[in-house]
Amino acid sequence: MAFDGTWKVDRSENYEKFMEVMGVNIVKRKLGAHDNLKVIIQQDGNNFTVKESSTFRNIEIKFTLAQPFEYSLADGTELNGAWFLQDNQLLGTFTRKDNGKVLQTTRQIIGDELVQTYEYEGTESKRIFKRG
């Protein structure tokens, strides 16, 4: 699958504002904007393994498409949700455990980049990754 591989964050759009709307404090927002995130994605049929490594943490997430699972963001925000594959895009719908609000996430390959889009409470952000 096209998502397989190692991806390093190259640039972000509106990411600090997105983190602010998510309730991340200013210190963590400033640090998060420069986290040097690297993502390794491996797909085996409907099963995915995603390894994230950054300045703040290293984590491995395993999930099966369309199957709910729990996940914690780098700031500790806990979510429940699932990923779906549609039109060569990974679409994630996650609900925050603390307030019940929904975070939408999309991962898609555009050209030679992995574009990850977040939408929360009307605020959209993108993180663009290059193979690395």
From Swiss-Prot:
Record has Acetylation as a keyword: yes
GO molecular function: long-chain fatty acid binding
InterPro entries, A to Z: Calycin, FABP2, Fatty_acid-bd, ILBP, Lipocln_cytosolic_FA-bd_dom
Subcellular location(s) of the protein: Cytoplasm
GO cellular component, one term: nucleus
Domain of life of the source: Eukaryota
Family annotation (PROSITE patterns): FABP
Sequence similarity: Belongs to the calycin superfamily. Fatty-acid binding protein (FABP) family.
Record protein name field: Fatty acid-binding protein, intestinal
Native source species: Xenopus laevis (African clawed frog)
Lineage: Eukaryota, Metazoa, Chordata, Craniata, Vertebrata
